[in-house]
Amino acid sequence: MSNNPLIDYPELPPFSKIQPEHVLPAVEQLVADGRARIQQVLAEGKFDYAHLVQALDEEDDRLGKAFGPAGHLNAVAQNEALRNAYNSCLPLLSEYGTEVGQNAQLCAAYQTLRDSDEWSSLSEAQQKDIENTLRDFRLSGVDLPEDKKAQYMANSKRLSELTSKFSDNKIGRASC
């Protein structure tokens, strides 16, 4: 995977090197890395800002740095192979986002940080970040019964598919 230009590039995205066949493997690898990092953080049980929030933000940043350039190229290149590669990632990203948002252990870890002595020493921005993350857990259905979580996941995937189809249709119409 080290030859994939979407993974761990130093500064600006290497747009000229990005090919459609790089997109899905990069996203799959980075989602797997994100899942592994979440499990590692939870297993370590050290729920302070550096070990919880910053660690997971770094993984999210890696995923965003990979998928962001792919999304940009998809929007401007009007290349069917790239569009297919981009679209093939959407269900995985939707599933991963919902999975993270509904992770009760992760939500509890953030709540532990919120209730800790460290809370008062965090900056206003850091506190707001944690509060927003706790809100996002609730909005993602972390407290729903399992059957409702599954329905939420299915709805999220379907919304992702429809949004992508709408964008594809817009691009197709613009090129007419």
For each of these PLM feature ranges, what is it?
Residues 1-175:
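Zn2+-dependent metallopeptidase catalytic domains
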